[in-house]
């Protein structure tokens, strides 16, 4: 089976795992860090805002079952694409919304999807989610992996603002 990877940053990585993890064709979702200038950063280093990293998820998927375009659509429905300085209660560069692309094809799909979202008029504010070339992805510490399964009540609490936003903007 041929597999591909997608990397999405949309705030706290804890909140970004579950929406993808539940989809057919998803083989693995890993929480981690990308986009910075320090190799193998720790959570504490990333939180210090000195490494340039963004919390993200790396998704391994079977493109015969789910397409990259479908993943991008799921991504939009999990984030506030108008907030460049974080997502919901999580603030700062390490929580900024970014689609990290692994190929020209992924870039083309992501850019077309972003243009479609802009043209939809769904949001009154500008769409500021960045589309950037993927950089090395470093898996986060084990206690961050599958957090929504390990600590469901904490994960749910962390998603209150996100879920309210999703209901308001994507309830169609």
Curated annotation (Swiss-Prot):
Domain of life: Bacteria
GO biological process, one term: protein modification process
EC numbers for this chain: 1.8.4.11
Reactions catalysed: L-methionyl-[protein] + [thioredoxin]-disulfide + H2O = L-methionyl-(S)-S-oxide-[protein] + [thioredoxin]-dithiol; [thioredoxin]-disulfide + L-methionine + H2O = L-methionine (S)-S-oxide + [thioredoxin]-dithiol
InterPro entries, alphabetized: Met_Sox_Rdtase_MsrA_dom (IPR002569), Met_Sox_Rdtase_MsrA_sf (IPR036509)
GO molecular-function terms, A-Z: L-methionine:thioredoxin-disulfide S-oxidoreductase activity; peptide-methionine (S)-S-oxide reductase activity
Record SUPFAM superfamilies: Peptide methionine sulfoxide reductase
Keywords, ordered alphabetically: Oxidoreductase
Keyword Cell membrane: no
Catalytic residue list: 12
Signal peptide start and end residues: none
Family: Belongs to the MsrA Met sulfoxide reductase family.
HAMAP family: MsrA (MF_01401)
Protein purpose: Has an important function as a repair enzyme for proteins that have been inactivated by oxidation. Catalyzes the reversible oxidation-reduction of methionine sulfoxide in proteins to methionine.
Name recorded for this polypeptide: Peptide methionine sulfoxide reductase MsrA
